[in-house]
């Protein structure tokens, strides 16, 4: 299971001796470039490494459009056609045909191993770009993952009593104030102090 697919994810997985083809599902918290830019490499590498099934991709509204315009007939059309020329790659085309689940707050994904719930967080106004935080539960343990967000009640709920909270902490408060004054990132991100307050409220 993979949460977001930013720069270097695929390379780091390979370095850790984890095959991208072994990842059951990918959850994209939102569709900003720094959270999805490695996704094409992740999918194509899985294809090249003989993945047989379609990767499950869970994300906000727009995820299906994003995936549909990447490979066959999309931005990576030339790459796809070159690799698909080989008979072996013709046999596992499912690997570059993701199964997309666009989620709403609540239960986003469940299989025999994991349960993933999500809720909207406060990064960008929702009518522009949906952004999700998630709670991942497996083997009696829970992990909360914020994606990008300002402090918000939804993330506190997702993180409540979790075994691990992975929360963004991008800028100090002085820079968050500066961004607000310049009209950039009025909602956006969480400072170190604010993250401490979220953790206390969530009892993690």
Regions found by a protein language model. Give the residues of each.
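Cap/insert and terminal regions of metallo-dependent hydrolase folds
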Residues: 133, 142-144, 150-204
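Binuclear metal-dependent hydrolase catalytic cores
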Residues: 1-143
């Amino acid at each position: 299971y993979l949460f977001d697919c930013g720069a270097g994810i695929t390379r780091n997985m390979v370095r850790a001796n984890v095959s991208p083809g072994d990842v059951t599902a990918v959850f994209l918290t939102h569709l900003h470039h720094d959270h999805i830019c490695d996704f094409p490499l992740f999918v194509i590498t899985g294809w090249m490494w003989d993945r047989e099934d379609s990767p499950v991709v869970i994300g906000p509204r727009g995820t299906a459009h994003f995936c549909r315009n990447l490979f066959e007939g999309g931005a990576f059309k030339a790459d796809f056609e070159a690799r698909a020329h080989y008979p072996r790659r013709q046999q596992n085309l499912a690997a570059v045909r993701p199964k997309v689940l666009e989620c709403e707050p609540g239960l986003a994904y469940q299989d025999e191993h994991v349960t993933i719930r999500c809720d909207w967080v406060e990064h960008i106004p929702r009518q522009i770009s949906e952004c999700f935080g998630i709670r991942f539960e497996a083997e009696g343990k829970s992990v909360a993952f914020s994606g990008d967000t300002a402090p918000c009640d939804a993330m506190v709920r997702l993180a409540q009593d979790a075994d691990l909270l992975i929360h963004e902490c991008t800028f100090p408060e002085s820079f968050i104030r500066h961004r607000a004054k310049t009209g950039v990132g009025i909602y956006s991100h969480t400072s170190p102090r604010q993250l401490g307050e979220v953790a206390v409220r969530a009892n993690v």
